[in-house]
Amino acid sequence: MEASTVYYTDFRCPVGTSLTEKLRRLCIAAGIKNIDMEGKFVAIKMHFGELGNLAYLRPNYAKVVADLCKEQGGMPFLTDCNTLYPGSRKNALEHLTCAQLNGFWPMTTGCQILIADGLRGTDEVEVPVPNGEYCKTAKIGRAIMDADIFISLSHFKGHESTGFGGAIKNIGMGCGSRAGKMEQHASGHPAVQKDLCRGCHRCAKECGSDAICYNEKNKAVIDQDKCKGCGRCIGACNFDAIYALCDNANEMLDRKMAEYAAAVCNGRPTFHISLVQDISPNCDCHGENDAPILPDIGMFASFDPVALDQACADACLNAAPLPNSQLGQNLATPGWNCHHDNFKDSNPNIEWKATLEQAEKVGMGTRAYTLKKV
């Protein structure tokens, strides 16, 4: 496959030039205005940040993208799907409240917010995975698949399971419904934390497989043989008593995530933007963010999400670790087994290259790229 073009700009701002203006110029240079958006729904997929985490992208960046879409006659909306785990984004109401508390309002973003998989994370579309090796179909939030055009706006940072979180993770994991996230993270089966179960029977009423019964203490029990892994019981429980068994090895998680991302992007115009800043060692899904492991690098954009992630990863690999960080402290530990890889030296149990390998294998894009500075 021919090398893709990735556009890049740094964070330096001479007097009179703002970061939002630099992002706008980057998107235009990368070709966002070549997409026919007239009268079309445009899903802008981003992470609104868990409450307590301050590393997420500011809403001002989202407004730049939304305004560009509206200038071209598009109807943009910001979107994400509910989380698989307890937290401030596990259902649509709390998710919207979280987004608003973190500054995401129509006034600040230039468009509305839709939680793509509905109130309880069950409003999904089963989408074929092109050339899927591990997943033949992907369970994706309905509003994302209803959009005519898909744009990812990603915070590129480290990640404790996948090495880094960039465009492919934002798309693959982020667009998965609750059942989709379960399929990627696990064998697809939930479990019950008995001390939190109230015996309300709401989960059993939601289960379409008759897989939930109750023991002598009126605590839910899931029959793993009957369970189809739809995740509806997790959304049904208001007490966080049901959770997903995250038993997939990191490399399998990476590869499934890449296939999910390919399903989201297949068959329609897409555009991808990543900001490599506040490079925390872990996911923005945490209720906190540790000190950045690397200095801020810049903003990147491309029509090819695989090339985009590779370019961002390469920039991070070539950056000098910050001493007062998880990465810096690991490298300073006597006897540390140095991997000469900023992602693996921050989180040693990851296999980040598998994501890019699988994404390229299923035809989502190419790891070969040409970098053009704007």
Residue ranges and their predicted role:
Residues 66-67:
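Terminal amphipathic helices with adjacent charged low-complexity linkers/tails
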Residues 2-53, 57-61, 71-80, 85-374:
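Extended, low-polarity segments enriched in aliphatic/aromatic residues
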